[in-house]
């Protein structure tokens, strides 16, 4: 595998390649070498950041012999919003094989500069203006080469984090005899090929729900309104939402799913997390809701059965110490088929997918929430409901035998399996943000406040890697009563846990920050920011909008900021103790815990706002010592 990255100028272009050992860089004068390199490595996998939408297109145009001026024209078109598919069709680029793995494929969009920040690398932006209307000087070329090598290395680090995903994709290609070009396809496209989907345009997209397809039994008239919302209509209304009280918890009912939770809630004692195993896939099978666009609808249940069989085989071989007897494809297949199975439901809602079947996707989502309401209704006399989400519920069981009996009846009726995880603590801000401690001591953190708690244990690179230390402090206080002061000062943390990677958007032309009372422009549009201890020297980070000459503050940052765009891998807080304001992070943890646990009516406000008083109220509410 190799990473590649292009730098495009008005009268020059640079093609950079890195294979993990050496950098290869070609300028436009080296077109023959570029073509020769491509011929030698055209069967390799080429990895790039956003390469599917940019680099792969321009690289193929270079191979066709386009001039630097023409390449720049195409580059500007793409940057300004032209659809790359149009360029591909017009120039017949699909005829040039390039096995491109786009790092951003099926991922949340983020820039390479943000990735460099998340990874702890130096955040390096070009010193050479891409819009220079002349040939580059020797010095400018050297600066561009240096910048290009930096980006290639950063992309290589990203690729290493996706190595298993690449192996899984190659295993699926081998198992189903797909063309190698499918390495560049989305998960939905690969899934559509494996399941032999056929592009379809069903006319019944918003057809009212047919309650006869599933054994839904809802007796409570109030709860029954959820069923009526989807049946008593001429067509399904995607914008309509229904709010009803179910088991003492306000729920929102909509096409996409069921959501309800006790807000700012905590409980210590026996808790059950009751989830439906593989909810959507099993509903598709049990209630005949597979995509009607599949040539052979029986393919989907076969895939599900195949995954269970290969998963069992792999686990058995590994447990017996016979892992070396498994092929690489077999080892990857449980994960590959899980990806296929879990991709289908989303593909059914995607208009240009071969599995597109909007009606069955709607009915599947509706069936799922109605069956959960059915389950809650039957359990209600024997439990307290904590929350409901798309595929499961959290409950406090008061009569465990009765709860188990109703769960078994529901399973027998639906043919679905409920997986019960017993826990001992839950702290819940709302349906999207909670911390659940399991009976075995394991922790499930969900939502923007706490999801980064275990980033360092789940791989180096995460798409969202800002202020990890806050997530650590919130979870450790809620579950273990660890004071935020101890969290911050009791460990010599790696510095990246305190970083805020901030990138200004395209509507802004410049970035700066306050130093000694002066606004100092920064060369970077993306910066790694920390709370600054020296409050007299450092101030806000600023941005300037296109067409204006005044500075605005960059949002969600401290009053006093210190920018460090250097490589901070291996750097500890103790190394910068004179620069970083640890008290700010401690107070931010407290502020977020207040937000997590206190209702608006329970907090101080306006002129009377006091973090100290809010923090005291948190401790009282949670029964902690003051």
Give, region by region, the residue ranges found by the protein language model.
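Short active-site loop/helix that positions an aromatic residue
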Residues: 15, 53-65, 277-291
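Helical catalytic core of nucleic-acid polymerases
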Residues: 98, 107-112, 122, 127-139, ...
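Conserved DEDDh/DEDDy metal-dependent 3′-5′ exonuclease domain
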Residues: 21-114, 147
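Two-metal-ion RNase H-like nuclease active-site motif
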Residues: 1-8, 100-102, 272-274
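C-terminal, non-catalytic extensions of nucleic-acid polymerases
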Residues: 334, 401-626
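Entry/capping segment at the start of metal-dependent catalytic domains
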Residues: 1-16, 23
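A residue-level signal for conserved active-site and pocket-lining positions in enzyme catalytic cores
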Residues: 48, 116, 151, 155, ...
């Amino acid at each position: 595998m190799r990473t590649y990255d292009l730098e495009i100028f008005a009268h020059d272009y640079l093609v950079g390649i890195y294979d993990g050992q050496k950098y290869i860089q070609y300028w436009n004068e080296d077109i023959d070498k570029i073509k020769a390199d491509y011929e030698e490595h055209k069967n390799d996998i080429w990895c790039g950041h956003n390469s599917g939408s940019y680099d792969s297109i321009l690289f193929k145009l270079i191979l066709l012999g386009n001039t630097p001026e023409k390449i720049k024209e195409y580059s500007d078109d793409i940057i300004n919003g032209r659809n790359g598919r149009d360029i591909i069709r017009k120039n017949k680029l699909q005829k040039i094989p390039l096995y491109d793995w786009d790092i951003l494929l099926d991922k949340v969009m983020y820039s390479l500069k943000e990735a460099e920040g998340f990874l702890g690398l130096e955040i390096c932006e070009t010193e050479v203006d891409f819009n220079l209307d002349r040939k580059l000087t020797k010095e400018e070329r050297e600066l561009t080469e240096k910048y290009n090598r930096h980006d290639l290395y950063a992309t290589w680090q990203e690729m290493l984090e996706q190595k298993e995903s690449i192996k899984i994709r190659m295993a699926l290609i081998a198992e189903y005899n797909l063309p190698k070009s499918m390495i560049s396809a989305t998960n939905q496209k690969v899934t559509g090929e494996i399941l032999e989907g056929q592009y379809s345009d069903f006319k019944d997209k918003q057809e009212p729900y047919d309650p006869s397809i599933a054994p839904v039994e809802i007796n409570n008239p109030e709860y029954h309104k959820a069923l009526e919302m989807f049946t008593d209509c001429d067509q399904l209304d995607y914008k309509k939402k229904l709010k009803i009280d179910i088991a003492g918890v306000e729920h929102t009912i909509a096409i996409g799913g069921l959501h309800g939770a006790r807000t700012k809630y905590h409980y210590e004692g026996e808790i059950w997390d009751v989830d439906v195993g593989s909810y959507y896939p099993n509903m598709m099978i049990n209630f005949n809701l597979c995509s009607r666009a599949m040539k052979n609808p029986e393919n989907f249940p076969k895939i599900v059965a195949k995954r269970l069989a290969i998963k069992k085989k792999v686990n058995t071989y590994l447990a017996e110490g016979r892992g070396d007897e498994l092929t690489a494809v077999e080892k990857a297949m449980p994960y590959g088929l899980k990806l296929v199975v879990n991709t289908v439901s989303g593909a059914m809602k995607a208009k240009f997918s071969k599995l597109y079947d909007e009606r069955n996707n709607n009915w599947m989502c509706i069936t799922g929430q109605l069956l959960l309401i059915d389950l809650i209704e039957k359990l209600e006399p024997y439990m307290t409901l904590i929350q409901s989400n798309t595929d499961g519920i959290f409950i406090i069981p008061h009569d465990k035998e009765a709860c188990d009996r109703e769960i078994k009846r529901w399973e027998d009726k639906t043919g679905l399996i409920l997986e019960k995880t017993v826990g001992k603590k839950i702290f819940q801000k709302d349906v999207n943000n909670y911390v659940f401690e399991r009976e075995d001591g394991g922790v499930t953190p969900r939502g923007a406040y706490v999801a980064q708690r275990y980033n360092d244990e789940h791989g180096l690179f995460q798409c969202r890697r800002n202020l990890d230390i806050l997530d650590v402090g919130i979870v450790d206080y809620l579950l273990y009563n660890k004071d935020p002061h101890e969290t911050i000062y009791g460990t010599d943390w790696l510095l990246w846990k305190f970083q805020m990677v901030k990138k200004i958007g395209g509507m802004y032309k410049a970035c700066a920050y306050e130093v000694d009372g002066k606004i100092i422009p920064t060369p970077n549009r993306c910066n790694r920011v920390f709370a600054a201890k020296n409050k007299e020297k450092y101030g806000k980070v600023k941005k300037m909008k296109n067409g204006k000459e005044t500075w605005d503050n960059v949002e969600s940052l401290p009053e006093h900021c210190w920018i460090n765009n250097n490589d901070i891998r291996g750097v500890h807080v103790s190394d910068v103790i004179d620069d970083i304001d640890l008290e700010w992070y401690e107070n931010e943890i407290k502020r977020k815990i207040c937000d997590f646990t206190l209702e608006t009516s329970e907090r101080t406000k306006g002129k009377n706002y006091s973090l100290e008083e809010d923090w005291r109220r948190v401790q009282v509410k949670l029964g902690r010592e003051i």
